[in-house]
């Protein structure tokens, strides 16, 4: 199960994904929350030793500047600021959203026209399913970013310094399956409640993704930013 930034077309695409979950006008989104989610996403990728392209890190530095300015006390100025990085970013994001929507319309028209001139490919039937799965995986990854940040703080408060590095995905898969032995569903954050260090947290998450990939468990999120629920997809023998 690949969780990579290549799932997005660039930093603006990742930001648009985060913003779209609020279902409000781009200029009305809580920008600090969006920035924190973006930064948490990149931090999680780095913790999992996944490559982060330079363009995403450049955007991260710009977002941190915007966040710091938003958190500073408001100062009344005689003249409005000419260059507002927040408004500039939101304007870029709005322009990108229009561009992406237009490109999707063109792609759809091209797909329809292609069906008139050639035999429809079997793969077309499954394109929506694949896209929906990718979106689900992105959502679970974003949820994990929040869980990971909370676990880091919890482990820091416990002053835990000893960390193992020999956790195996296969072992964690068995532990997760054992957690389902007496129930058919679990909340995602329940899987990490007993984790002793960040290596175990990350390995548990990778094991969860593998179980999703082989259809041993399925994922549900009923509301935007809602709790991620994992469901068992096998019957006890």
UniProtKB/Swiss-Prot annotation:
Residue ranges that the Swiss-Prot or TrEMBL entry lists as coiled coil: none
Superkingdom to which the source organism belongs: Bacteria
Alphabetically ordered keywords of this record: Cell cycle, Cell division, Chromosome partition, Cytoplasm
Localization: Cytoplasm
Principal cellular location given in the protein's record: cytoplasm
Gene Ontology terms describing biological process: cell division; chromosome segregation; DNA replication
HAMAP family in alphabetical order: ScpA (MF_01805)
Family note: Belongs to the ScpA family.
NCBIfam families recorded: PRK00104.1-2 (NF000993)
Function of the protein: Participates in chromosomal partition during cell division. May act via the formation of a condensin-like complex containing Smc and ScpB that pull DNA away from mid-cell into both cell halves.
Protein name: Segregation and condensation protein A
Organism: Streptococcus thermophilus (strain ATCC BAA-491 / LMD-9)
Higher taxonomy: Bacteria, Bacillati, Bacillota, Bacilli, Lactobacillales
């Amino acid at each position: 199960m690949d969780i990579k930034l290549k799932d997005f077309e660039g930093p603006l695409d990742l930001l648009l994904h985060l913003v779209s979950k609020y279902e409000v006008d781009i200029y009305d989104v809580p920008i600090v929350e969006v920035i924190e989610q973006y930064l948490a996403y990149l931090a999680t990728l780095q913790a999992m030793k996944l490559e982060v392209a330079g363009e995403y890190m450049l955007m991260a530095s710009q977002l941190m500047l915007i966040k710091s300015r938003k958190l500073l006390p408001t100062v009344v100025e005689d003249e409005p600021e000419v260059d507002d990085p927040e408004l500039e970013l939101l304007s870029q994001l709005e322009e990108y959203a229009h561009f992406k929507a237009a490109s999707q319309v063109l792609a759809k028209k091209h797909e329809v026209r292609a069906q008139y001139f050639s035999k429809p490919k079997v793969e077309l039937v499954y394109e929506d399913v694949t896209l929906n799965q990718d979106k689900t995986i992105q959502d679970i990854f974003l949820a994990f970013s929040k869980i990971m940040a909370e676990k880091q703080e919890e482990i820091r408060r416990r002053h835990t310094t000893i960390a193992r590095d020999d956790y195996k995905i296969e072992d964690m898969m068995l532990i997760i399956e054992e957690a389902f032995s007496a129930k058919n569903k679990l909340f995602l954050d329940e899987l990490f409640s007993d984790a002793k260090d960040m290596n175990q947290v990350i390995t548990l998450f990778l094991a969860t993704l593998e179980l999703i990939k082989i259809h041993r468990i399925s994922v549900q999120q009923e509301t935007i930013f809602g709790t991620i629920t994992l469901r068992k997809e096998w019957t006890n023998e």
